[in-house]
Amino acid sequence: MTTEDTQYAHQPVMLEEVLDMWFSQSEGFYVDGTFGRGGHSRALLSRLGENGRLIGIDRDPQAIAAGQQLAASDSRFHMMAGRFDCLPQAVEQAGRPIDGLLLDLGVSSPQLDDAARGFSFLRDGPLDMRMDPTQGESVAEWLSYAAEKDIANVLYRYGEERKSRWIAKRICETRKEQPITRTLQLADLIESVLGRNEQGKHPATRSFQALRIHINGELDALDQVLEQSLETLAIGGRLAIISFHSLEDRIVKLFIRDHSGRAPKGRGGLPLGDELPQRLEPVGKVMRASKAELKVNVRSRSAVLRIAEKVA
């Protein structure tokens, strides 16, 4: 691991903002739906009272192991293995509604920094990208058989890659000659199609994001957990979500808007579609990482934090 990797590996994003705006009850029940290496959870436990409770959820085996170690040393904490949309099971286990749900979306720094996990286009490793390497198929496996149009659709839908068809065509041409099994192999292929036209941004960024989202079903899980939050949060409970790209943030933004009585209206103030009853109230403004945090944690530069409180 490089010096830069060590610096960023265990820095939870927007920690103070999350604790100040999201945490409200020292004896409450909280869920960290994306435990990772436990940065947010450990900070929350430092504020949680003796009778408070925190459940961490993650599907990454290394994160689960870290969570189990924490659980062994703190009886207020319990670790659950699974996607964050297993929220109902967490509530059932605790026997009470949630006072706060935190989701820190996307890939974690330890996952990105470990070449063997296959998330990074800067490090050579197996083209995997699964959050749980024991479940489902890897990106390499999917690319070995997926139809050209399906590859293009994934790159466009989840990566907003304008030249998705060009990349998909090159992938299908290349795999006829040799399998695409390594991260740098795919990154170089994409760069050969796009060139390096965006200053400060690797040409494979959008495609790697798209493939990761697809192979892990990330946006489907986000849709599900947002709906689950309406039924599992206590009145006054708060939902805090940190997103790192526009697709995630758009889903969160529209969900909070639609459930807070702020859906857009047409002429005469009439709703454009079915108007949902208000169940959420936004808390504060949309937040981004401070200048001070950006200096010590460059990976927080694209982070967006939205918080909403359940009111009904």
Swiss-Prot record:
Subcellular location: Cytoplasm
Presence of the UniProt keyword Methyltransferase in the record: yes
Matches recorded under InterPro entries: RsmH, SAM-dep_MeTrfase_MraW_recog, SAM-dependent_MTases_sf
Record's keyword terms, sorted: Cytoplasm, Methyltransferase, rRNA processing, S-adenosyl-L-methionine, Transferase
GO biological process: rRNA base methylation
Catalysed reactions listed for this entry: cytidine(1402) in 16S rRNA + S-adenosyl-L-methionine = N(4)-methylcytidine(1402) in 16S rRNA + S-adenosyl-L-homocysteine + H(+)
A molecular-function term among this protein's GO annotations: rRNA (cytosine-N4-)-methyltransferase activity
Keyword Zinc assigned: no
Enzyme class: transferase
Binding site for S-adenosyl-L-methionine: G38, G39, H40, D58, F84, D104, Q111
A Gene Ontology term for the protein's cellular component: cytoplasm
Gene3D superfamilies: Putative methyltransferase TM0872, insert domain, Vaccinia Virus protein VP39
EC number(s) given by UniProt: 2.1.1.199
Family: Belongs to the methyltransferase superfamily. RsmH family.
Function: Specifically methylates the N4 position of cytidine in position 1402 (C1402) of 16S rRNA.
Protein name: Ribosomal RNA small subunit methyltransferase H
